[in-house]
């Protein structure tokens, strides 16, 4: 039996997760220097051929930067979550997903996406995560509900793989970037635009992914250096070197 219990009344004391504070008012504070240091670490990791894939790159980045507290949005059956927990020394990893029976996007747009029910997938995720004890915390709720449970600048790492629609990805990046501390890492999956399987309107037409254009625009607007790492589909990431 799983030792992870989901409590709908859960309140996260994320003040305890903020390990580091950076005094950005200091005259010698150098945002670009922070980015350059992380880039140097990333470049060393990327020297290995296999390290160009997210399953290798992100665990090595997390360990190299000594990141301790993270959130993953869009967990499904916790395959990537369990990989991160296995390969890193991360101390708290919050796994956020609605675990719904259907995927919905937009107004009056609803399409069955999953072969198994939300409850089955949730139970599978909890079972897999149970091996990590209190390092893994599944949160069965929407991304926008979960984000209210964390203080600004309280997280080291966030990985976004939830709502792939234009509005959904924009809301996720905007909201969760505020929760990552200065010097932390914001990242996500499926860095692309175009059709996304399983997302259909009422007429059976595929609704487009809009992750690339939204991520590009957000980073350009706020002055973040956007990076990508390979795999079956690209992942994106940037250092939060200043407030958005």
Describe the role of every protein-language-model region.
Residues 4-66:
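Class I SAM-dependent methyltransferase Rossmann-like catalytic core
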Residues 42, 55-244:
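S-adenosylmethionine/decaboxylated-SAM
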């Amino acid at each position: 039996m799983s030792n992870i219990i989901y409590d709908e009344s859960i309140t996260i004391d994320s003040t305890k997760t903020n390990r580091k504070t950076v005094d950005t008012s200091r005259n010698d504070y150098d945002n670009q220097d922070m980015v350059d240091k992380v880039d140097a670490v990333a470049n060393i990791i990327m020297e290995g051929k296999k390290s160009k894939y997210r399953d290798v790159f992100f665990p090595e980045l997390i360990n190299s930067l000594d990141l301790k507290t993270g959130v993953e949005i869009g967990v499904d059956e916790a395959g990537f979550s369990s990989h991160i927990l296995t390969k890193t020394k991360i101390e708290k990893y919050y796994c956020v997903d609605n675990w719904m029976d259907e995927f919905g996007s937009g107004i009056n747009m609803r399409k069955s996406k999953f072969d198994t029910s939300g409850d089955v997938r949730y139970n599978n995720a909890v079972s897999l995560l149970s091996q990590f004890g209190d390092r893994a915390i599944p949160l069965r709720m929407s991304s926008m509900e979960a984000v209210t449970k964390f203080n600004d600048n309280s997280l080291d790492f966030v990985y976004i793989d939830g709502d792939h629609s234009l509005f959904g990805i924009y809301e996720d990046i905007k909201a969760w970037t505020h929760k990552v501390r200065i010097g932390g890492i914001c990242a996500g999956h499926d860095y692309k635009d175009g059709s996304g399987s399983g997302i259909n309107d009422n007429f059976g037409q595929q609704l487009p992914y809009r992750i690339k254009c939204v991520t590009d625009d957000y980073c350009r607007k706020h002055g973040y250096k956007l990076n990508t790492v390979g795999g079956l589909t690209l992942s994106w990431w940037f250092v939060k070197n200043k407030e958005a």
